[in-house]
Amino acid sequence: MKHLMLLRHAKSSWDHPELSDEERPLAPRGVKALPLMGKVLEAMNPPVERIYSSPAVRAIETAKGVIRELSKPPEVEEHPPLYLADVPTFLQLTHSLASELECVMFVGHNPGIESFCEWLCFGRESGSTSLRTANLAWLELPIENWEETTAGCGVLRSLIPSRLIKALL
């Protein structure tokens, strides 16, 4: 059994029009959401062993902000193809993962990360999954090796909105 966490980056700032899309940082609201999501991840089993993030500033800040709350923070690897990635790009990365990894997180952007979640769970992009900023989808994949990942093989174990976490903690 493999576990895949799909985390959409936290709320980004639009206060700096001179910055490119890839350079936009998190907004204060986005930064505030990260410790709460980190606490949720700390309680999950199995723990996240590696994080692959889009190189966009807001995605890297999201990944690094979340792991500050973890007792055993995983390595965060910038993966340039994840910037505005589509389903085939996410799948290519998934197929390349080392088989010894049991739980991996991807930090990325819509619409691609949302589409990948739908493709894994429903076998197609259905438009029925909503990954808002700082929302986490936890998927179980009943596979032994990551290269076995196919359309519809995933089971959505939890969809965790950051607003719900704030209300609970």
What does each of the following model-derived ranges do?
Residues 18, 117-120:
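Short, flexible helix/strand-to-coil boundary loops that buttress conserved ligand/catalytic motifs
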Residues 2-81, 89, 113, 127, ...:
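Active-site-proximal alpha-helix that buttresses catalytic centers in soluble enzyme cores
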Residues 102-118:
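A glycine-rich beta-strand to alpha-helix segment
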Residues 82-96:
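Short phosphate-binding loop-to-helix
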Residues 152-169:
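Charged phosphate-binding loop/patch that engages nucleotide di/tri-phosphates or the phosphate backbone
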